[in-house]
Amino acid sequence: MYAYLKGIITKITAKYIVLETNGIGYILHVANPYAYSGQVNQEAQIYVHQVVREDAHLLYGFRSEDEKKLFLSLISVSGIGPVSALAIIAADDNAGLVQAIETKNITYLTKFPKIGKKTAQQMVLDLEGKVVVAGDDLPAKVAVQASAENQELEEAMEAMLALGYKATELKKIKKFFEGTTDTAENYIKSALKMLVK
């Protein structure tokens, strides 16, 4: 088991980043790959969790230990796998997530991709009173500002598809952002907030 990997971020895709450590490139599946776009070709420390399946060995990466703990809590719930957990974390509303669990707000929880009513109820049952978010260690929410190219919007939509959101949902989001400019990371954060609320 690994606690973290330290190395150079060499590649960012819609689903993962590549972290090169001692000449080996590790594929790390992360909640929002474009959050790392400012760190390409720079050293980074990424907290990791390894999932071993019959057909694959996968590494999931996190910006902080608290984000990793939240991920581990989410995948402990029956019906939530690593991809769904990453999609929930990508919404970047961890305080809202904890509040929804504590107040049994099933409607809020079912807005995440692949989370139906039964899974949301299971989340409340399994995690109520157990999930604590230390806000300072988790990525901060960032408002959309007009400042980048439409290529960034395309990358953001690709990443959202990779998280499991439907193309029909994303068409509405894309239309909303047309004519604006921002980073892929900020588009993703804003889109996730819109889809979850």
Curated annotation (Swiss-Prot):
One MF annotation (Gene Ontology) recorded for this entry: four-way junction helicase activity
CC annotations in GO: cytoplasm; Holliday junction helicase complex; Holliday junction resolvase complex
Subcellular location, record wording: Cytoplasm
UniProt entry keywords in alphabetical sequence: Cytoplasm, DNA damage, DNA recombination, DNA repair, DNA-binding
InterPro entries reported for this sequence: DNA_helicase_Holl-junc_RuvA_I (IPR013849), Hlx-hairpin-Hlx_DNA-bd_motif (IPR003583), NA-bd_OB-fold (IPR012340), RuvA (IPR000085), RuvA_2-like (IPR010994), RuvA_C (IPR011114), RuvA_C_sf (IPR036267)
Annotated region (Domain I), positions in chain: 1-63
SUPFAM superfamilies noted in UniProt: DNA helicase RuvA subunit, C-terminal domain (SSF46929), Nucleic acid-binding proteins (SSF50249), RuvA domain 2-like (SSF47781)
Signal sequence, renumbered to the chain: none
GO biological processes: DNA recombination; DNA repair
Ranges where the record places region Domain II: 64-142
Region annotation (Flexible linker) ranges: 143-147
Classification via Pfam families: HHH_5, RuvA_C, RuvA_N
Region (Domain III): 148-197
Gene3D superfamilies assigned: 5' to 3' exonuclease, C-terminal subdomain, DNA helicase RuvA subunit, C-terminal domain, Nucleic acid-binding proteins
Similarity comment: family membership: Belongs to the RuvA family.
Primary role: The RuvA-RuvB-RuvC complex processes Holliday junction (HJ) DNA during genetic recombination and DNA repair, while the RuvA-RuvB complex plays an important role in the rescue of blocked DNA replication forks via replication fork reversal (RFR). RuvA specifically binds to HJ cruciform DNA, conferring on it an open structure. The RuvB hexamer acts as an ATP-dependent pump, pulling dsDNA into and through the RuvAB complex. HJ branch migration allows RuvC to scan DNA until it finds its consensus sequence, where it cleaves and resolves the cruciform DNA.
Oligomeric and partner information: Homotetramer. Forms an RuvA(8)-RuvB(12)-Holliday junction (HJ) complex. HJ DNA is sandwiched between 2 RuvA tetramers; dsDNA enters through RuvA and exits via RuvB. An RuvB hexamer assembles on each DNA strand where it exits the tetramer. Each RuvB hexamer is contacted by two RuvA subunits (via domain III) on 2 adjacent RuvB subunits; this complex drives branch migration. In the full resolvosome a probable DNA-RuvA(4)-RuvB(12)-RuvC(2) complex forms which resolves the HJ.
Swiss-Prot/TrEMBL domain comment: Has three domains with a flexible linker between the domains II and III and assumes an 'L' shape. Domain III is highly mobile and contacts RuvB.
HAMAP family from the UniProt entry: DNA_HJ_migration_RuvA
Protein known as: Holliday junction branch migration complex subunit RuvA
Species in which this protein is naturally found: Streptococcus pneumoniae serotype 4 (strain ATCC BAA-334 / TIGR4)
Native organism taxonomy: Bacteria, Bacillati, Bacillota, Bacilli, Lactobacillales
Gene that encodes the chain: ruvA
